[in-house]
Amino acid sequence: MPVFHTRTIESILEPVAQQISHLVIMHEEGEVDGKAIPDLTAPVSAVQAAVSNLVRVGKETVQTTEDQILKRDMPPAFIKVENACTKLVRAAQMLQADPYSVPARDYLIDGSRGILSGTSDLLLTFDEAEVRKIIRVCKGILEYLTVAEVVETMEDLVTYTKNLGPGMTKMAKMIDERQQELTHQEHRVMLVNSMNTVKELLPVLISAMKIFVTTKNTKSQGIEEALKNRNFTVEKMSAEINEIIRVLQLTSWDEDAWASKDTEAMKRALALIDSKMNQAKGWLRDPNAPPGDAGEQAIRQILDEAGKAGELCAGKERREILGTCKTLGQMTDQLADLRARGQGATPMAMQKAQQVSQGLDLLTAKVENAARKLEAMTNSKQAIAKKIDAAQNWLADPNGGSEGEEHIRGIMSEARKVAELCEEPKERDDILRSLGEISALTAKLSDLRRHGKGDSPEARALAKQIATSLQNLQSKTNRAVANTRPVKAAVHLEGKIEQAQRWIDNPTVDDRGVGQAAIRGLVAEGRRLANVMMGPYRQDLLAKCDRVDQLAAQLADLAARGEGESPQARAIAAQLQDSLKDLKARMQEAMTQEVSDVFSDTTTPIKLLAVAATAPSDTPNREEVFEERAANFENHAARLGATAEKAAAVGTANKTTVEGIQATVKSARELTPQVVSAARILLRNPGNQAAYEHFETMKNQWIDNVEKMTGLVDEAIDTKSLLDASEEAIKKDLDKCKVAMANMQPQMLVAGATSIARRANRILLVAKREVENSEDPKFREAVKAASDELSKTISPMVMDAKAVAGNISDPGLQKSFLDSGYRILGAVAKVREAFQPQEPDFPPPPPDLEHLHLTDELAPPKPPLPEGEVPPPRPPPPEEKDEEFPEQKAGEAINQPMMMAARQLHDEARKWSSKPVTVINEAAEAGVDIDEEDDADVEFSLPSDIEDDYEPELLLMPTNQPVNQPILAAAQSLHREATKWSSKGNDIIAAAKRMALLMAEMSRLVRGGSGNKRALIQCAKDIAKASDEVTRLAKEVAKQCTDKRIRTNLLQVCERIPTISTQLKILSTVKATMLGRTNISDEESEQATEMLVHNAQNLMQSVKETVREAEAASIKIRTDAGFTLRWVRKTPWYQ
């Protein structure tokens, strides 16, 4: 099957596929319509010459390379493409003699498919060799990083730095060139992010090594902390480089990124459970411990973390952990209620406390078992991935020693571990059967090699068979590991709501549990938010969570009994939909308030830690103050991370922002203990310049990361809501200050005034970011003016607060302070108003009917229609434009003979134009009728401004019936999104609706419904045309959008569409060559279908996201823009 994960491969395969599509159509015309196939001798001869050149250059490459895998994998690809070319030549010769020959048509279609598949195999094999070159450089850096452990002198450090620099530069250059070549945006982003992290960590590594060498050589205190800093940095850089190596080897969408994240999440949950257990047990043992104190909160946190772990499990494990959490939560509520009534020492309460204590131990054991299983399966999977390269190298080398056999045995051992942990017997048996086959084949190959027959045809065939079996075994183990994990809901709130809504609308359809998983995720986040709230607010949010939980369970129960469409189910679905809206609104309100509180000041704790670390050695209580501030800093960092995660989970962020928040939270958790270690080194070595510089490096890295986190959190929540919450919080702080003055409490006053100043500065930061993000001059001026006014009010308030604190009983000073506080409130209100959307100016009301009267004059007659005029003819469609082969840029490394030969094949395919003049002329001379309109560009003659919104053709897509065809399901998903809006005056919506209909048609064609090869190929072309229209219009909207962030999001989404639509055309051609053929294996046909399905789903999703981003961008369109789109909801949101 063709793969096109690089731009070069895609650009070569596209014209080849385009011409093969014409051969497919010719074949079908001859087979179905009985038409003669024109003489193809000339174009086939040109392709034969290009293929021969490609093979010749490939063989020369094989002879000169030292890459054993390339030497092994190239020859089969040569044979494949040469055989296909031979069939094409044979077909051309037979058709020249008999244009109606049936065997010739068979050779034509099989040869066409083989040319495309064989060329793809050649390019992929060569590309894999290029990737191995990059990986070798990466592994060289990995090995050199371990040398950091033996650097103990400054001379060694200087040498190490000089040697590391060039290698890092080379790796960075190769990674940058590679990411530009990739077609998958996700892979590009992963490579860039990991490489940027490595670059950022390089100065940290040098700093950590320097302080280690300094402390060791001077025998100073803090050598253990220095060692931790160095080892942490080495491990972090190694992990990122290993991630680069993993991503480099991906040729399809990455579906395995969950493994390390889930393992980390479970370990973090277990660590937190362990840290809170003593506090929780202490509260349970003390019958007089009050409800709601730290001990009860510890129990809630344990249950919360265990619930997170349970959500990462599947099947029986999941049910047991979540069920235990729920039961213990209810028992804790009952115990708290008994103690609140003064009955904590009664036998019933004591028994309840003991049961909860035992239940916590049982719950912890279940989470530990789940974590061990996940880690074991993940480790085995990763071990197989690491060992398979060495095994393949051994198989490729006819003279390889026994060490390669050990690698194969190691792979089999890890696969056996996965099989033992499988819950599904069929999967387990399948893996074990593969292990038996590989063992027998490997023993046979080893025997041949021991007898000096390793280079014999039999041994080579065995090696190839084992290599294929190992790849299949890896796929089976990967699938088995993935199947032990639960279905994943979307990572952001809107995605979860959409998934939940789809299930609520159609609970009888099998969505693999995604909809219910989304609802569970929303409820879990709601309960996590409730845990940090107090009093009636907590109970209110928990009640909303319970309500959603109950309704979802009732609907699922009815669906399981086959009553998902009953009136009772419809009523419950409506209630569930309303309850979800209520829960979402309450969650976002609670989250915004928490962000306003926790992120009002992000850097003061680390600054106080720096002051404590640099305090003179004779400062009283120096150690105690440092430890207190270090603990405060760690708690503060933990709160920031937890709040940021909540903002990501229930905010309005898109997937990119959510993943960005998660990455910064992870970095903050890793960096925080390293900052404390660096501070402790400085504390124990006062005046040490190296220690000071190292602490500053770590501190600045932590601050930069938190600033990035803060910006992403601000993106994730509505700015207006954040400003409202901040304004309300300032009012409460001002009220506290009034109470403090009334009670003569200067410390309380200072705390309140400090909080007001921090919140005001936070508002200034938010406003500044929004000004930088906008290109709307009016908005920028309004926000900047309001921000400047607010900025001027903060210092006077602080000065007045200090004056009152010095003489708190002075009424005049109190009045001055309150006036300053009210001025800040007024300025904050003006900033908020600057973000308020302008209300439209409504026209004046119509006059009273009493004052209206009708005249006796008749309306003027209707003008006559023009006579004798004929509408102008429709202009001819534009010629298909072939993609140019990407020009080689100066300094690029892709100048190998292999690529030059591929370029020649590309050029030959282009010469064989989509409407070949020679073929048409020869056909015309032979009296053959060729319909040129078959290849005409599709024309959408119905402009969107006159399109009827009823759109009866959409009724072809049943929306309330179970859909088990993934392409049709993807089309319906886009269709639902597009039909929210009227297509009148909105070409993006019109094009999206056409794409949905075309994709529904493709679903029928791919699954063997009505239609033929030509219809499938034409359908893919039509989809590509509509895709180009969506992309063009989206870029026009982006160009006029004044919001930089929204514009970037829109461009990132829509730029994926052309690549995916091009791939759709190629895959449709491949699938068309298989329709109706009996010499195609079921496995090969299914593989082609799976690739086409995956591509179609990605295209529909990208267009759907483009529609959403375009609507958001249209709100921020330039007022003087000539380009406008009407966004009119068919069903308003308030209905």
From Swiss-Prot:
From the UniProt record, which GO molecular function terms apply?
actin filament binding; alpha-actinin binding; alpha-catenin binding; beta-catenin binding; cadherin binding; dystroglycan binding; muscle alpha-actinin binding; protein homodimerization activity
Instruction: Using the UniProt annotation, give all residue ranges assigned to the region (Talin-interaction).
Output: 168-208
Show the SUPFAM superfamilies listed in the entry: alpha-catenin/vinculin-like (SSF47220)
What InterPro entries does the record tag this protein with? Alpha-catenin/vinculin-like_sf (IPR036723), Vinculin (IPR017997), Vinculin/catenin (IPR006077), Vinculin_CS (IPR000633)
* Compositionally biased residues, Pro residues: 860-876
For region N-terminal globular head, the annotated ranges are 2-835
The known PTMs are summarized as:
Phosphorylated; on serines, threonines and tyrosines. Phosphorylation on Tyr-1134 in activated platelets affects head-tail interactions and cell spreading but has no effect on actin binding nor on localization to focal adhesion plaques.
Q: Return the similarity comment.
A: Belongs to the vinculin/alpha-catenin family.
Describe its partners and assembly state: Exhibits self-association properties. Interacts with APBB1IP, NRAP and TLN1. Interacts with CTNNB1 and this interaction is necessary for its localization to the cell-cell junctions and for its function in regulating cell surface expression of E-cadherin.
- Protein name, entry field: Vinculin
